[in-house]
């Protein structure tokens, strides 16, 4: 069931709105109680003997969290800092009591056992060899990562509301297009907790900042600073890099596709993805949207091909990894994945981001540069 559509339908009448409001207040109470239990020792938080940096958000879906984790992991790994990602692996098949590890020869673990987002990240980071350890118990996953890989930094993927594993820094993403989830907690809005949770943040990334005007961005920053007066707020954008022609396994430039196209996705914020394609010059004549993390079937792919006709089809990397194994028997040509990366606006601002990941990062780079000059 598409929860977003269900919520919108319920909001169309007074009884539906009241029902969502009651559920939202119940959810809010649950978040308050959970936080209270951890803060007062009724539930235990655990530390590990290395730096832990959380990359998360206060709203559900669509902020660009996965691309931020990829940027953080690549930034650290390319600087020679041993890094691992800790993830829950949302909606994966939980067949293993032990953590699932994605690394090098263990990449044959498929997305069903690992989760679509961790599996996609493992593919994207294969060249810099960043392991990803997946388990619902993030402390158990962190312990496994430290034991196996001697990680200097653990990136806690989407763990801002997860208190079982202590962390050294919280990087929180806020979407400039819809920053505070309508001001209501789930399921009435998309907030995962009240805005007071921003007091725990050490750094905020205002994502999709190029899709909001300056006045709106300043208003968002003012609201953030009402909760956390001295926090650094950086602006980030999602930048298209290229298309990947999956049928021929080649990268093609962004100007390769123009005119009519079909698009399908099962992601948190499909509207942003579709707007990006329009900005790149595509006219979207067929659009398929599915709930986040949905598995694709052979029938889905056949439908896309039949209805798209001679027009190209475009999707995301996250969707691509969820194709059925025999997808090549169905998709013969004109199917593309849009590659997108996150960029921090400004060199000084990027250095602030890097220092939040690893406090000695700038000094480390200075030493590397001085050595290279010799």
Curated annotation (Swiss-Prot):
InterPro entries noted in UniProt? LpxK, P-loop_NTPase
> Could you tell me the keywords of this UniProt record?
ATP-binding, Kinase, Lipid A biosynthesis, Lipid biosynthesis, Lipid metabolism, Nucleotide-binding, Transferase
Specify which residues bind ATP according to the UniProt entry for this protein: 59-66
User: In this UniProt entry, which cysteines form S-S bonds?
Assistant: none
Q: Which GO terms describe its molecular function?
A: ATP binding; tetraacyldisaccharide 4'-kinase activity
Q: Name one GO cellular component term.
A: plasma membrane
Q: In which pathway does it act?
A: Glycolipid biosynthesis; lipid IV(A) biosynthesis; lipid IV(A) from (3R)-3-hydroxytetradecanoyl-[acyl-carrier-protein] and UDP-N-acetyl-alpha-D-glucosamine: step 6/6
The signal peptide annotation in the UniProt record is: none
Question: EC number(s) in its UniProt entry?
Answer: 2.7.1.130
Name the reaction it catalyses. a lipid A disaccharide + ATP = a lipid IVA + ADP + H(+)
Q: Which GO terms describe its biological process?
A: lipid A biosynthetic process; lipopolysaccharide core region biosynthetic process
Question: What family name appears in the similarity comment?
Answer: Belongs to the LpxK family.
Give the protein's biological function.
Transfers the gamma-phosphate of ATP to the 4'-position of a tetraacyldisaccharide 1-phosphate intermediate (termed DS-1-P) to form tetraacyldisaccharide 1,4'-bis-phosphate (lipid IVA).
Read off the NCBIfam families from this record.
lpxK (TIGR00682)
User: How is this protein named in the record?
Assistant: Tetraacyldisaccharide 4'-kinase
Q: Which species is the source of this protein?
A: Elusimicrobium minutum (strain Pei191)
């Amino acid at each position: 069931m598409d929860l977003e559509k269900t919520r919108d339908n319920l909001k169309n009448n007074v009884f539906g709105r009241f029902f969502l409001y009651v559920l939202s207040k119940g959810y809010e109470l649950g978040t308050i109680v959970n936080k209270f239990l951890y803060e007062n020792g009724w539930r235990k938080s655990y530390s590990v003997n290395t730096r832990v940096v959380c990359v998360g958000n206060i709203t559900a879906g669509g902020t660009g969290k996965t691309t931020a984790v990829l940027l953080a992991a690549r930034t650290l790994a390319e600087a020679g800092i041993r890094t691992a990602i800790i993830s829950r692996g949302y909606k994966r098949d939980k067949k293993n009591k032990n953590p699932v590890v994605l690394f090098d020869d263990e990449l044959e673990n498929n997305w069903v056992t690992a989760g679509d987002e961790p599996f996609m990240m493992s593919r994207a980071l294969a060249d810099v060899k960043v392991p990803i350890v997946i388990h619902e118990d993030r402390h158990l996953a962190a312990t496994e990562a430290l034991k196996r890989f001697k990680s200097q930094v653990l990136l806690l993927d989407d763990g801002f509301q997860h208190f079982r594993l202590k962390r050294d820094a919280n990087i929180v993403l806020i979407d400039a297009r819809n920053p505070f989830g309508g001001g209501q907690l789930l399921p009435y809005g998309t907030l995962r907790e009240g805005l007071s949770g921003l007091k725990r943040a050490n750094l905020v990334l205002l994502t999709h900042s190029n899709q909001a005007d300056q006045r709106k961005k300043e208003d968002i920053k003012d609201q953030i600073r009402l909760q956390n007066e001295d926090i650094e707020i950086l602006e980030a954008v999602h930048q298209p890099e290229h298309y990947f022609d999956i049928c021929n396994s080649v990268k093609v430039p962004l100007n390769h596709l123009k005119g009519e196209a079909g698009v399908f996705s099962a992601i948190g914020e499909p509207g942003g993805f579709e707007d990006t394609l329009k900005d790149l010059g595509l006219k979207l004549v067929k659009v398929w949207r599915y709930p986040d993390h949905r598995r694709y079937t052979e029938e889905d792919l056949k439908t896309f091909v039949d209805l798209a006709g001679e027009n190209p089809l475009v999707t995301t990397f996250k969707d691509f990894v969820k194709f059925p194994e025999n997808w090549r028997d169905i998709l013969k040509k004109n199917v593309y994945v849009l590659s997108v990366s996150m960029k921090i606006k400004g060199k000084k601002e990027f250095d602030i981001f890097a220092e939040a990941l690893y406090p000695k990062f700038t000094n480390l780079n200075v030493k590397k540069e001085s050595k290279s000059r010799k």
